[in-house]
Amino acid sequence: MKDNFTRLQSIVGKQLGIDPSKVKLESDFGRELGADSLDVVELVMAIEDEFEVNIEDQSASQIATVQDVLNYLERN
């Protein structure tokens, strides 16, 4: 089974239409990966589906990087 980072690379790549290999731990969804606010909402929904979690709005608003997502997944 893929590790969480590899799964996230795939999700982000698919949602944003970019090469998953360009998605790094420190990648900022908005500044570096070009995601707008709608993209971020769709990313959160895709992450929730893939990892079977519910990311509350307050938590989602604090997620800016791939590492932030991984940290959230580890805590929940």
UniProtKB/Swiss-Prot annotation:
Residues 2-76 form the Carrier domain. 4'-phosphopantetheine is transferred from CoA to a specific serine of apo-ACP by AcpS. This modification is essential for activity because fatty acids are bound in thioester linkage to the sulfhydryl of the prosthetic group. It is found in: Plastid, Chloroplast. It comes from the Eukaryota. One of its GO terms (molecular function) is acyl binding. The keyword Cytoplasm does not apply. The modification O-(pantetheine 4'-phosphoryl)serine is found at residue 37. Keywords: Chloroplast, Fatty acid biosynthesis, Fatty acid metabolism, Lipid biosynthesis, Lipid metabolism, Phosphopantetheine, Phosphoprotein, Plastid. Pathway: Lipid metabolism; fatty acid biosynthesis. GO terms for cellular component: chloroplast. Belongs to the acyl carrier protein (ACP) family. PANTHER family: ACYL CARRIER PROTEIN, CARRIER DOMAIN-CONTAINING PROTEIN. Carrier of the growing fatty acid chain in fatty acid biosynthesis. This is Acyl carrier protein. It comes from Phaeodactylum tricornutum (strain CCAP 1055/1). The gene is acpP.
